[in-house]
Amino acid sequence: MVPKLFTPQICLLLLLGLMGVEGSLHARPPQFTKAQWFAIQHINVNPPRCTIAMRVINNYQRRCKNQNTFLRTTFANTVNVCRNRSIRCPRNRTLHNCHRSSYRVPLLHCDLINPGAQNISTCRYADRPGRRFYVVACESRDPRDSPRYPVVPVHLDTII
């Protein structure tokens, strides 16, 4: 007879713990609103090469982010996408606060090419430029955000 090592309750706690660790890897630094963090991660009109552009994000998160997309547009243009018709978010089908861009924008997608990097100063990325539609999730602004925009982008859901 084999001893029972894990009860269903322990398995659930382990799973929730792993999800918490994964969620914390993608957590927004507390000094930023969701919209501010969105802008830092995804808005860059003239991004340099990925390895350089990703340093800011990696410095805040203290790790090498696996991938990221920079939209080569302004925050104001992305706010305007929030005025488009609401759709179900392609990546999170339970959310209905997504909006699809009306036109393709230039972008730079970055893929980590050395995932075993132990130090954020050694993160290296492959550059994949493109021109695509995108979908953002939008929410009412945080009181710390500029009152100029009542609804702001908070999440880049997908690139089409």
Swiss-Prot record:
Which cysteine-cysteine pairs are annotated as disulfide bonds in the entry? 50-110, 64-123, 82-138, 89-98
* CDD domains referenced in this protein's UniProt entry, alphabetically: RNase_A_canonical (cd06265)
Question: Which residue intervals make up region (Required for nearly all of the bactericidal activities)?
Answer: 28-72
What Gene Ontology molecular-function terms does this entry list? endonuclease activity; nucleic acid binding; RNA nuclease activity
Which positions in this protein are listed as binding substrate?
65-69
Record keyword Ubl conjugation present:
no
Q: Which InterPro entries match?
A: RNaseA (IPR001427), RNaseA-like_dom_sf (IPR036816), RNaseA_AS (IPR023411), RNaseA_domain (IPR023412)
- Summarize the protein's role: Cytotoxin and helminthotoxin with low-efficiency ribonuclease activity. Possesses a wide variety of biological activities. Exhibits antibacterial activity.
Q: Tell me its family.
A: Belongs to the pancreatic ribonuclease family.
Write the protein's name.
Answer: Eosinophil cationic protein
Q: Which gene encodes it?
A: RNASE3
